[in-house]
């Protein structure tokens, strides 16, 4: 099985459904005998450029380990979900479990406030 980093952007009107979406996608991975190493909810952020006249989106990142069939099923689910406006899957050499630089930065800002 290979390691992947998956980032998907959710339409801002659907932000309240993000936790249910993460559970659904996690279930797809675990049902395919994969594992989830890290889940980060980066929250609603400004987009670098508008996508379909949308200027903000809710970002979520997953680090998973699964086979190609499970990854294909996950990508199909992204493609047919209208709430997911973009997704990106990157193959990694190994599992990444420490917090991302963006999550570390958010933690520092939260502690400083």
From Swiss-Prot:
UniProt keyword terms in alphabetical order: Ribonucleoprotein, Ribosomal protein, RNA-binding, rRNA-binding
CDD domains, per database record: bS6 (cd00473)
Gene Ontology molecular function: any one: structural constituent of ribosome
GO cellular component, one term: cytosolic small ribosomal subunit
Pfam families hit by this protein: Ribosomal_S6
GO BP: translation
Keyword rRNA-binding attributed: yes
Keyword Glycosyltransferase on entry: no
Family named by the database record: Belongs to the bacterial ribosomal protein bS6 family.
HAMAP family from the UniProt entry: Ribosomal_bS6 (MF_00360)
Record's function text: Binds together with bS18 to 16S ribosomal RNA.
Protein name as catalogued: Small ribosomal subunit protein bS6
